[in-house]
Swiss-Prot record:
Organism: Synechocystis sp. (strain ATCC 27184 / PCC 6803 / Kazusa)
Family: Belongs to the UPF0150 family.
Name of the protein described by the UniProt record: UPF0150 protein ssr1765
Pfam family name, one: HicB_lk_antitox
Biological process per Gene Ontology, one example term: regulation of DNA-templated transcription
Length: 79
């Protein structure tokens, strides 16, 4: 049995506080990869697992794994 070496992937995730409590987490580079959690820590844990499963499914289907090319730039808008 051949063991495939693990690879590290780095992605930006965004977390939003929900109005009714908890957090919504998503990875913009991985379309449709979303999760949630009652706490910030739980949301981070859940989105990490969701990303792992997402990448594993891409690899299993011999699809390319997207590379992070997201640029995050905070803006100040004077209105």
């Amino acid at each position: 049995m051949t063991v495939t070496p693990k690879q590290i992937y780095n992605y930006t995730v965004l977390l939003e506080k929900e109005l009714d409590g908890g957090y919504h987490a998503f990875c913009p580079m991985l379309k449709g990869c979303h999760s949630q959690g009652d706490t910030f820590e739980e949301a981070i844990q859940n989105i990490t697992e969701a990303i792992e499963l997402y990448i594993e499914s891409l690899i299993a289907e011999h699809q390319p794994v997207p590379k992070e090319d997201l640029i995050v730039k905070p803006l100040s808008i004077l209105v």
